[in-house]
């Protein structure tokens, strides 16, 4: 389901995202974009922005987020206003069925999407986009309808710049669910064959 993410885990994700990227923060006019597809109250975006500013206080960091829960969305948008950012970068809606950032590409993506939640509500829109092939986000395959977390991963991959990095939290089922040739298996094959997986970090129970 939807989960609160501790600051320790967010800072670990932030550090992993920028590891080896220090050279990108030398010189003037540094500009970076950060996206969270299930931003909640936007704490991941805030922590990532803080981390990038530690690397270069003068860097122009622009954050973007989408959230389906109206309560947490309101908090995220208010926080953006308080911090002097652009509230229009905070969008309300279901990321899977109503993508508010279609066509966008980001430097960094950080997210803790819900897992173990069916995507039956979004089935019509997701299936239609899958049929578009590479013109959509879900061309590699569709997971079992009982768990949509791999759809969020595909959404993130579709929004990365060529040199972009993504840190995303998933439960263990993403590693082994589905027989060979099934949707989940094809998604994993897509990741491996394109060399898009740098690391898997197993978090402790109840982290």
Task: List the model feature ranges, each with a label.
Residues 142-206:
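Conserved Class I SAM-dependent methyltransferase catalytic core
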Residues 44, 68, 130, 138-142, ...:
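Aromatic-residue hotspot detector
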Residues 61-64, 136-140, 203:
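Short beta-alpha connecting loops at secondary-structure transitions
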């Amino acid at each position: 389901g939807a989960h609160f993410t501790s600051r320790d885990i967010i800072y670990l994700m932030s550090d992993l995202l920028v590891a080896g990227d220090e050279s990108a923060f030398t010189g003037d006019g540094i500009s970076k974009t950060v996206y969270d597809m299930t931003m909640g109250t936007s704490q991941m975006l805030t922590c990532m922005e803080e981390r990038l500013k530690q690397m270069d206080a003068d860097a122009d960091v622009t954050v973007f987020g989408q959230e389906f829960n109206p309560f947490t969305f309101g908090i995220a948008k208010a926080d953006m206003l308080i911090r002097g950012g652009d509230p229009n970068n905070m969008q309300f809606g279901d990321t899977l069925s109503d993508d508010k950032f279609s066509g966008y590409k980001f430097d960094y993506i950080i997210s803790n999407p819900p897992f173990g939640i069916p995507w039956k509500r979004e089935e019509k829109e997701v299936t239609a986009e899958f049929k578009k092939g590479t013109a959509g986000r879900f061309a590699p395959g569709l997971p079992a309808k009982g768990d949509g977390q791999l759809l969020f991963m595909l959404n993130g991959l579709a929004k990365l710049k060529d040199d972009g990095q993504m840190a995303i939290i998933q439960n263990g089922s993403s590693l082994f669910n589905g027989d060979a040739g099934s949707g989940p298996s094809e998604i994993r094959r897509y990741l491996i064959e394109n060399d898009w997986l740098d690391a898997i970090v197993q978090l402790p129970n109840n982290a």
